[in-house]
Amino acid sequence: MKKTGIRGQGSGVGVLLALLATPLAAQTSLSIYSDGRVVVRKTIAQRLDKGRNIFSFDLPGLDPATLFSPDSSVAVTSAVLRPATDLETAMRNSIGRTVTFVRGKGDTIQATVLSVTPPQFKMPNGLLQLAQPGEPLFPAEAGLIRTKPEAVVTLEASRVRENTDLVYVSQGVTWEAVYQAVLGGSGSATVTGAATINSAALRVDSASVQLVAGSINRARSPAAPMMQAAGALMRDEAAKSVAYAQEETVGETHVYELPGLISFDIGSPLTTALFPRARADYVQEFVVPGAVPWRGYFGPMAPDPNAVPVQVWYTFKRAHGTAFGDRPIPGGTMQLFQRDSSGRVQLVGEAAFTHTPAGKDLRVQSGDAFDVTAERVQTDYHQASIPNTPPARGSHSRVTASYRVTLTNAKNQAVTVDVREDHWGNWSIIDSSVAPEKLSSSEQRFRVPVPANGTATLTYTVQVDS
């Protein structure tokens, strides 16, 4: 790499100006977060003299406030970010210079720039022109035009260093995890997962890349990243790799190291597998949500039956000691597929889910049932004022409500439907045609069997004191 600049002699202070390559290259390691943050770690293969060193770097997407060196012998004492030169800045830099201008018919004329605002130019005949005489052509001189953003960084070194590491937090690259589960008829599924990287601001050429899954607070507004120009980048390193991401725990996050060196471009998504195909047992459930979550309130309802959704849930078993259970699963999207009679896979559901630690089952709602339907009607509602038990004074409100839920199954096989009831505070089910099962202090369920091509009816009464 060509170096330009000067070194101080006898002062113990070294000053070096150097320009690095445009894309984030092989000396770079990136940690990409799903919220758009990127931790950029860059090894600077430049000698640092003891004392002050000034570098001119190309650090794409730099937020100067976040720049630091993890090297204990090197401190960042200042960082100035200079954008690529626009036309107005180039004209201001040319004040006092003679610039060539291209006019309408393709001929050129030279004029001396006296002022930009207001425009003032001295023409070859000595006259002054108060309008720009054409499209300017600027000489490719250092200091006049910057073709890309540039960071001028001052580093203070306590000893001579042959290279140093710089770290900063950038923006504009996100990743998401998408999983595919092909459901078998025997309650077993094959699961695959991949991460897709999307860059809106950074080009990356042959870098080590980690994906970070976890919830991390953001305490400051991000600086707008300086955009890099898009360009073609080879991705052979990722394409030829047959390895999968390696996971480790760092703090309260999980970090996934992608295999090999990764290249990606602005606006060109890159997808890489997270883990080998795994097999997992699953359970399908039909769930009717409780009256309060479905209606949004607890009170008198219209006497006519209300159609309520029958939700379809899948629980993937992830016991320790299994290929799918031993790995933490970053939150993302689960796509569910099932084969038709011709063996073609059809999309039968899709759901978002949060980060799932190793050993914890993964439960997703894929949609609503087609052939299993439900209607709920409130058959009775009574509200009374009940005296409080002494020594408490006054009274409290007691609401008693009765419901009838009719379940219809148009399938050729019997199903079991979970009918849920959710309330807060002091409540109980005082009567029901099917025994309730307490799931928590706020939720109970009824497991109602429904015959093939038939119906089943559930009745129950809820009592709530408030």
Where are these regions (language model features)?
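Positively charged n-region of N-terminal signal peptides that target proteins for export
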Residues: 1-3
